[in-house]
């Protein structure tokens, strides 16, 4: 199960922190721009939710999707960039 997976939990925490660092360093504006991470050994990725400000991001708000871009865990919609990120991970 994704919610109980310690690797997914750690990626959620790491990515939430990285997004806050992007904003703090002036590398993104409003809600545009995001990073993602592929879950090692699984056809899953973790990505920022759509429309959520960087200051409001938490590990719990990060979204887990499969490599087709379909949300498999998380309460919010994934980023509008999810399809691009999923495409890259499918072809790496």
Q: Where are these predicted regions, by residue range?
A:
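An anion-binding catalytic pocket shared by soluble metabolic enzymes
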Residues: 2, 9-92
């Amino acid at each position: 199960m994704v919610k109980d997976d310690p690797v997914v939990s750690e990626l959620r925490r790491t990515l939430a922190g990285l997004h806050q660092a992007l904003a703090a360093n002036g590398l993104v504006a409003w809600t545009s721009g995001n990073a993602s991470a592929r879950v090692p050994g699984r056809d899953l990725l973790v990505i920022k939710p759509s429309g959520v400000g960087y200051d409001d991001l938490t590990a719990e708000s990060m979204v887990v999707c499969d490599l087709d871009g379909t949300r498999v865990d998380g309460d919010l919609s994934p980023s509008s960039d999810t399809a691009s990120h999923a495409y890259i991970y499918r072809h790496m």
